Amino acid sequence: MFFHVYGENSFYQFLGFILVFIGLILTNEFARYSPTTGFISFLGIPILITIYLFFVNICGELGYKWAENNSTYIRMNGWFHYAKLYAADIGSLGFVLIKYKIWIGKYDWFKVWPFVIVAINILIAVVSDFESAVKGARNLDIKGDRWWLSSEGIWLYGGWWNVLNGIAGIINIFCMTDWWGIYSSKDKKDMLWPDMTWQFIVAYDIWNFEYTYCNLTTHSWYCGLALLLAPTFANQFWNKGGWIQNRANTLSIWCMFAQLFPEFLDNSIFSVVPSLYKRYENKLVKDYEKPTAADPTSQGIIAILSIVSNIWVICTIFKRWIERKRNPYTNPIFNDTDDYMDAYKRIGQGDTEEIIKNEPSPQIDDLNI
């Protein structure tokens, strides 16, 4: 229903999905292992990649053939990919500082950094969603259909689903609660946000999947499914409370990979296109051919799920706000839930004493940690 995953390449398409999923989990485990691996992943490697990208783009603009024919220069030149790459990376780098209490990471005022950088990342996507909606509407008026060609040679189909999902993204920002409730785990491997429970994660995942499905169409099999499932899987089974760190780390790693190897996504046996492209056209991306037909049904369905799920979460937050008479953005609002308590049990001793002092609840008082 959502993707064209059949035919002679179906084995490789599913194999690619599994490899990306496992690869993201393993590289996230490497990144969270120690301060050294964290700085290697989000400072050392990004510096090297930045130098490479700088020379590729400069040489491409100067007309050097090797750069003009480079897949990164051709397929990853849009503002979104660069904004996302560096926004995700500085987010992960900030998380390393917080969990190890290095430099500004040891100050309480910096605890709001996770909220700030996640909000920025969401807004980047929201702007992109609205951009697609506007360009789709303009082309419908001028050319009679909603197709528009991105700077990276990908045909996108903008419509009301982008508007709906953009609104859902704005709501999602305010579904993040207890902005200063950020702590280190006992083993210092993880930055924990206990009040970011499954409700937010579900709403975020649906919203972000719809974003990738509408705007990163030829990449969404990987960055819309595998990339979202990897941090959620880790959070569910062994890294409770660390979802936002998992998400930032895997997103940073994925953006670096995609920026360097776009051919894996666009023109290989692993490439997958969504059902938006009504008929599977194997040369769709490679030859920049305008699709002959569109089926935006799935885009519309997921957009509705996105807005409904985010409205549901924000209503839950407001309901708890009224019942508890506590600001959900400066206080925990879900600290009576199992999700919160599972994360709380992983918090280091110094931070738990701070929570008991500032965030009293019967569940926390009953724990003997």
Feature-to-residue mapping (PLM):
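Membrane-interfacial helical/loop segments at transmembrane boundaries in membrane proteins
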Residues: 1-2, 62-77, 131-155, 268-293
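An N-terminal, globular interaction/scaffold subdomain
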Residues: 2-103
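Alpha-helical transmembrane segments of polytopic membrane proteins
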Residues: 8-18, 41-49, 74-93, 108-125, ...
